Amino acid sequence: MKIETYIDSLVSYAMNCGLAEPDDHVVLVNRLLDLLRKDDYEPSDEPQTEDLEEILKGLLDYAVEKGLCDDGITARDIFDTRIMGALTPMPREVIGIFRYLYLENPEAATDWYYKFSCDTDYIRRYRIAKDMRWKYASSYGEMDITINLSKPEKDPKAIAAAKNAPQTAYPKCQLCVENEGYAGRMNHPARANHRIIPIQVAGEDWRLQYSPYVYYNEHCIVFNSRHTPMKIDKSAFRKLLSFVDAFPHYFVGSNADLPIVGGSILSHEHFQGGHYTFAMETAPVEKEVSFQGFEDIRAGIVKWPMSVIRLTGADPERIADLADKILLAWRGYSDESVGVIAFSDGEPHNTITPIARRRGQDFELDLVLRCNITTAEHPMGVFHPHADKHNIKKENIGLIEVMGLAVLPSRLKKELTDLAEALVTGAPLTGDLEKHAAWVSGMNYEFTAENALDILLQETGKVFAAVLEDAGIYKNTEEGKAAFQAFVNYVNQ
């Protein structure tokens, strides 16, 4: 296909999805010619393609051939983001449409903004489609298991280039507002096609965007316009509840503010939300509890592998007050019978992962108790995936996993496929498969070519549920339930 055909196809794509109008045609063609360092142009007589992945590949192959772009994943991503940036409207236009739609209906505004973020290729739909997703029916509810394949692995050239690249503090991190329209470099993603929505959260200037990796439907990131550290406190609870007041069709939660039990970015205050129902949301209250002075707030312990107190009521300020009381109690609480130590050597260990949503007209806040204490037996964390499950999951249990969605490493796609084949043929488990030997030795199945992979996928789901039990403070035993009640009693003292 001629390069002009790809240029024409991309301009038609922009028109068809509303990124541009017919009056923009000549300017868009000229922008693309400039990026491709092409001086001449005749409209193509070949049939156009509507497949964005195919269009961008054609343009990238041309750029590589002409020496405009290195032929590595990172370099190609930077260049095709520049291409899409040439078609992306300015922030004022995007913000204007969002605000106009929001006045009609918040859901209409986010529907439009999500589609826009996909159409600009900020969210690469064709990569997201490669992710593996399946369900596991646990005793706590139907959990989501995913193997993330859409986040590209860095190629060796990019790793070397990033190592040799001059260090810069702009943007300060991948969440800062300065990423909007940023060209990118070998050690920082390109965001030329990225547009952010300014919003108010509890009276503060915040921003709304989507995650480019979309772990679940309309996976959004809500972040402070200032580069300020994560902090779980009463203010955080008020902000979460403020967001679901403004966007009642979305849930929103925050990672904890301590290492091991927190997320990967602790330096910039942010939340994650979206339009998705997680297993934790549908998990019932197993035991109702009452907090003195807050009889207007319904409270209960949730039937979930992690230790969750659910607060529901009509007044978000009252919920935030009670959540703060529980948090302050938990920060200073120790119970050596279950391994909870509030402080060691002056370091705090206890915090909370909070999740807010609307329940009809009411507001709801789930408080997940966390503790990042380590021991000689569990050097990565007592309430962290234990070593016998590291073949499947050894990374931190963050907000998304807490709610019942496993984000598993991409290595597992090949490992589980190869493992299934080895179980059928009886081949020895060597190399990358050796780490799975103890796991599969405990399985009692008749493996066949037809069922082996399905069995392993379900067993992977079982491991994830057990990982959440590892991360839970109070185990689902009589002793664990009694210890949980002891903490509730402590809050009420």
Predicted features, each with a name:
Residues 193-195, 225-252:
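Helical scaffold of the NTase/Pol beta-like nucleotidyltransferase catalytic core
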Residues 1-222, 226-229, 303-305, 319-323, ...:
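Active-site microenvironments that recognize anionic phosphate/pyrophosphate groups
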